[in-house]
Regions:
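Bacterial N-terminal signal peptides that target proteins for export
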Residues: 1-10
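C-terminal motif of bacterial Sec signal peptides marking the signal peptidase cleavage site
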Residues: 20-22
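Extended ligand-binding regions for polar small-molecule ligands
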Residues: 24, 64-73, 131-134, 138-152, ...
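Extracytoplasmic small-molecule ligand-binding "clamshell" domains
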Residues: 29-103, 173, 248
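Periplasmic-binding protein-like
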Residues: 44-45, 121-128, 204-243, 261-271
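Ligand-binding cleft/hinge of the Venus flytrap
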Residues: 53, 67-76, 153-175, 203-207
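Acidic, polar ligand-binding/catalytic clefts
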Residues: 64, 68, 77-139, 211-216
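A ligand-binding cleft/hinge motif common to bilobed small-molecule-binding domains
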Residues: 90, 103-112, 156-159, 183-219
């Protein structure tokens, strides 16, 4: 009799376990369906104030905040990957990253990627030391200029397509953009060319006193680049969300956390 009671009790426990296990599995599926968003991997190098790590090692910056908000509105979770900027095209085409979003200029690259609409306007400029005798782009003739590799300034100085830009003496193409500024400060180069907002950020962060030439190299739009073979339509959806974020004030609020007079940047930049 005692054996039957134990067997019956064991059977009841087994049934209860099955029922509880079934309920748990059902809840797990529910949770997955409702709360886990698909991931979008955003690729950029370190490029303050657009994309960099804060003191706790977390991604932050204009592009990080814009991407987080925009993709959330589209139903995605943005995850940020620090990439070798020279390898950006290969990375997005291979699918290792979903898009390139790092102060990236559309101008001259229209046919290389699927682009979102421009979300910001900015320009490439030339800073020199405060005691320099360079005051115009024409004064760069025969001088040494540092640029980051695979950027618009490198292309501008190497292509000789712009009649305003003279033949310089030497071009220093650097993979690590942060080396350009010590080279300028030490006098190893006479000028650098880069994104205006990045230069201003560097000057503020390190107390550098450079003089930026009045005449910009180029003013263009910044966009988000997807692979040409990517047929998900994310660039179109992102463009629509950008318009939404302009209209409801979110874009101005995010840019204003990093730059003064954010409305001046909300037109359509260059790198």
């Amino acid at each position: 009799m005692q054996g039957r009671k134990i067997a019956a009790f064991s059977a009841m426990l087994a049934c209860a376990a099955l029922l509880l296990g079934g309920c748990g599995a059902e809840k797990a599926v529910d949770k997955t369906d409702k709360s886990v968003k698909p991931v979008i991997v955003v690729g950029s190098d370190n490029y303050p104030p657009y994309n960099y790590e804060d003191v706790d090692g977390r991604p932050t910056g204009i592009d990080v905040d814009l991407a987080t908000e925009a993709f959330a509105r589209m139903g995605y979770k943005a995850v940020f990957s620090v990439i070798d900027w020279e390898a950006k095209k290969e990375l997005v085409e291979s699918g290792e990253i979903d898009c390139i979003w790092g102060s990236f200029s559309i101008d001259g690259r229209e046919d290389q990627y699927r682009w979102s609409a421009p979300y910001m306007v900015s320009c490439q400029v030339v800073p020199v030391r405060s005691d320099s005798d360079i005051y115009t782009l024409a004064d760069l003739a025969g001088r040494r200029v540092a640029v980051q590799t695979t950027t618009k300034p490198e292309d501008i100085f190497l292509s000789h397509d712009d009649p305003r830009i003279p033949a310089v003496g030497e071009i220093f193409s650097m993979q690590n953009r942060e080396l350009m500024y010590p080279f300028l400060s030490k006098g190893y180069v006479d000028a650098v060319a880069a994104h205006e907002t990045a230069i201003l950020q560097c000057m503020a962060d390190y107390g550098l006193e450079y003089r930026i030439l009045d005449e910009p190299l180029l003013t263009v739009g910044l966009g988000v680049a997807f692979a040409k073979e990517d047929e998900r339509g994310l660039e179109k959806a992102l463009s629509a969300v950008f318009e939404e974020m302009r209209e409801d004030g979110t874009m101005e609020q995010i840019i204003g956390q990093y730059l003064n007079e954010p409305r001046g940047y909300m037109g359509g930049g260059d790198r």
